Design a protein with these regions (language model features):
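Juxta-kinase regulatory segment immediately upstream of eukaryotic protein kinase catalytic domains
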Residues: 1-31
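Conserved protein kinase catalytic/activation segment
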Residues: 173-188
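Conserved structural core of kinase catalytic domains
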Residues: 92-140
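Catalytic-loop of the protein kinase fold
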Residues: 156, 160-177
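Activation segment signature within eukaryotic-like protein kinase domains
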Residues: 148-149
Length: 309
């Protein structure tokens, strides 16, 4: 275990091995996220009066057990994902930074609280501590939580329209600013273009509480049906009984409950076949149809000044 200081303000950082962070010496570091099993270490910095989020691979944190070079390669692949997927809900990507001993992605800083803040809250505290972001989320009105879910599902449908599968998407990918009622998707590093296959078996990326049967199965294809399952699991976490999938714990309508139960079917061919179909049914059931799926997708593309190909 190595304790070092980084940034011009000498912010403390603990590593498994020593590493040179001189490239941060001219900026102020105001927070560090160093408990990621992906091998990344992330920083909140202030440079020229502006806040940025840096995601860095190249140093060994205390949680990562793999090879540092593999973490670097994964983050380099993630660069392409952030370049190709741009959405109003997604944390705003700026540019890559190649270091002598590592690789970094830079983003605009987004204020918000993570729905799976495991570095500050134990699993018990996550569900019971008054200041836990997840507890605060569950205290919002059902209408507010349905609105959050609708935004998440719209983002997922857009990602699908670009030919991507959302690998390792879970509540830790979700930030919420309670003061501004603003949702941010913060982590899409492992999203992949179709086709995607499980090459590692039960250790496939993903949070156990949301993982799908095929995410434990070696050589299984990871598809839109997989993503539908994960999205329904998030719905049960936000407005249901979490692991208890009974209707008694569900806080919304029977129609939405039945829809999410269908999405959680263990057999892929009995789920919704696409995120688009799941999302459109969701919109229909909550009475928020303000345009077809294609119109919503096109509006995002127009705002970006791009097409969806």
């Amino acid at each position: 275990m190595i304790n070092i200081k980084i940034g011009k303000n000498q912010y403390p950082l603990t590593l498994a091995e020593d590493h040179n962070f001189d490239w941060l010496k001219e900026v102020e570091v105001f927070t560090v996220f160093d408990q990621q099993d992906s091998g990344n270490i992330s920083f909140g910095i202030i440079e020229n009066g502006k806040r940025y989020f840096l995601k860095y691979a190249g140093a060994r944190n205390l949680e990562y057990k793999g090879k540092v070079k593999d973490a670097i390669q994964r983050l380099m692949k993630a660069k392409e994902v952030y370049e190709q997927i741009q959405h109003p809900l997604l944390v705003s990507y700026i540019n890559p930074i190649q270091m002598q001993n590592g690789f970094c992605l830079r983003f605009h800083w987004m204020d918000g609280e993570c729905m799976h803040n495991h570095w500050d809250f134990t699993p018990f505290e996550k569900h019971h501590a008054p200041n836990s972001p997840f507890v605060k989320l569950r205290q919002l009105s059902v209408k507010e939580r349905l609105n959050i879910l609708t935004q998440i599902f719209e983002f997922a449908a857009y990602v699908e329209s670009l030919g991507y599968v959302m690998v390792d998407f879970y509540d830790g990918s979700i930030l919420y600013n309670f003061e501004q009622s603003k949702l941010t998707i913060c982590d899409i590093d492992f999203f992949q273009k179709n086709p995607v296959f499980n090459k590692v078996g039960e250790d496939f990326w993903g949070a156990g509480r949301f993982k799908v049967p095929e995410e434990y199965e070696l050589h299984a294809q990871i598809t839109s049906e997989t993503n539908v399952y994960v999205l329904a699991g998030i719905a049960f976490a936000f407005i249901g009984g979490k692991n208890d999938k009974s209707y008694e714990k569900w806080e919304s309508t029977l129609e939405l409950y039945n829809m999410c139960k269908k999405a959680l079917h263990k057999e892929k061919n009995k789920r919704y076949r696409t995120v688009q179909a799941f999302y459109e049914d969701w919109l229909a059931y909550i009475g928020e149809i303000g345009g077809s799926f294609s119109q919503r997708i096109n509006s995002i593309s127009i705002n970006r000044g791009e097409n969806t190909k």
